[in-house]
């Protein structure tokens, strides 16, 4: 069974950013260039500036990652982001409309810290898809520059007894 632990999250400060809906974004790998531009325009503190930094004309190899790191430092300094004082498990709920329908769904889960172990150790965490070299390199370079995970790894869990659902 995977060991899930609490952690101290960096969170947007609502008083600094306004409506939290304007600072969130879909996963970086589903965003088009137009999506990124729209999100950047929606709020100067939209997370896309950290999670999917764009290349600017004249950029050297790692400039966009360094720019994300500078943005992160500025947001921490000016109060846009705040690091929680205590380790926590963060409950998450997101309601959305299924594209092209009037159907509304709610996704519930949590954010926690999980140690990644090699598969052969039997950690209980199974691979979910084939991963490609370029996106892995991109995420590694962003992590190396910023020192933070800017987007979660999404996992599914089996809960036949409903225990996790009751807790959430």
Question: Where is each model-derived feature located?
Answer:
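A cross-family signal for N-terminal binding/gating loops and helix N-caps
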Residues: 1-168
């Amino acid at each position: 069974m995977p060991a899930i632990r609490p952690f101290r999250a960096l969170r947007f400060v609502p008083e600094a950013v306004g409506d939290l809906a304007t600072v969130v974004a879909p996963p970086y790998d589903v965003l088009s260039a137009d999506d990124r531009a729209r999100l950047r325009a929606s709020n100067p503190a939209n997370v896309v500036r950290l999670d999917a930094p764009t290349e600017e004309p004249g950029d050297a190899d790692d400039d966009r990652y360094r720019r994300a790191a500078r943005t992160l430092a500025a947001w921490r300094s000016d109060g846009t982001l705040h690091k929680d004082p205590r380790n926590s498990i963060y409950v998450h709920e997101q309601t959305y409309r299924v594209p092209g329908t009037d159907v509304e769904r709610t996704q519930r889960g949590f954010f926690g810290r999980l140690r990644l172990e090699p598969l052969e150790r039997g950690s209980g965490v199974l691979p979910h898809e084939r991963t490609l070299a370029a996106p892995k390199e991109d995420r590694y370079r962003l992590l190396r520059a910023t020192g933070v995970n800017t987007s979660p790894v999404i996992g599914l869990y089996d809960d036949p007894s409903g225990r996790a659902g009751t807790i959430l």
